[in-house]
Design a protein with these regions (language model features):
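N-terminal beta-alpha "docking/capping" segments at the starts of catalytic domains
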Residues: 1-42, 187-197
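Soluble acyl-CoA-dependent acyltransferase catalytic core bearing the H(X)4D motif
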Residues: 35-197
Length: 197
């Protein structure tokens, strides 16, 4: 990463749809979603860590931590080591920044399965899928380099630009003029909920 790129990554604001998640998230309501992939063989933690670091080099916008400013939350560049650990908690659990080196995603493994839990302020599902696919691809490339030497793709293209999709897709001129039909109302006599017929 060049010095200029690193400077641009020092901080950036949350996009419009991501602003609600830091305010509404808690240990009870995590705002975390999960992606998983099941491999043919048990996962090697060291290789998985290397794969995640390789993927992070391509997806720099995932190398951030969430900070609270005076008026709003923002992302700040995070160069700490990514924590990779064996899965021991339930899926989509609140990501505690203190145990995860402040990253907004958590990579775990269990036997043959690779998981990534992602805090929704960091990204939407599409970017998360692209990032996760890159992790899995990097893992396969490292683990099976000799077997797949001539079969691995080197022409993969990425769009590395962060965008606020809400601003890109929102059109305030479009009004919701659709009229919905009334719901069908059942007729007849109500029976008690616990009645057996």
């Amino acid at each position: 990463m060049t010095r200029k790129e690193k400077k641009e990554l020092i901080w950036r604001k949350l996009d419009n749809s991501a602003k609600i998640f830091p305010l509404s998230s808690s240990r009870k309501y995590s705002s975390v979603f999960r992606l998983s992939a099941v491999m043919k063989e048990n996962i090697s933690p060291k290789l998985l860590e290397k794969a995640v670091n390789n993927a992070l080099n391509k997806f720099e916008f995932f190398k951030v931590r969430l900070k609270k400013g005076f008026f709003w939350y923002y992302f700040e560049y995070n160069d700490k080591k990514v924590v990779i650990e064996e899965e021991k908690d339930y899926p989509c659990k609140y990501i505690d920044p203190n145990t995860n080196n402040d990253y907004l995603f958590k990579v775990t493994y269990f036997e043959r399965k690779i998981n990534i839990d992602i805090f929704h302020s960091l990204t939407d599902g599409n970017s998360a899928i692209q990032f996760f696919k890159e992790i899995v691809y990097q893992y396969i490339e490292i683990e099976y380099a000799k077997e797949f030497k001539d079969k691995l793709r080197t022409d993969r293209k990425f769009n590395f630009n962060a965008e606020d999709s809400y601003l890109k897709n929102y059109n305030k001129k479009v009004k919701n003029n659709t009229k919905s039909k009334k719901a069908y109302i059942l007729k007849g006599r109500k029976i008690p909920f616990d009645a057996i017929r």
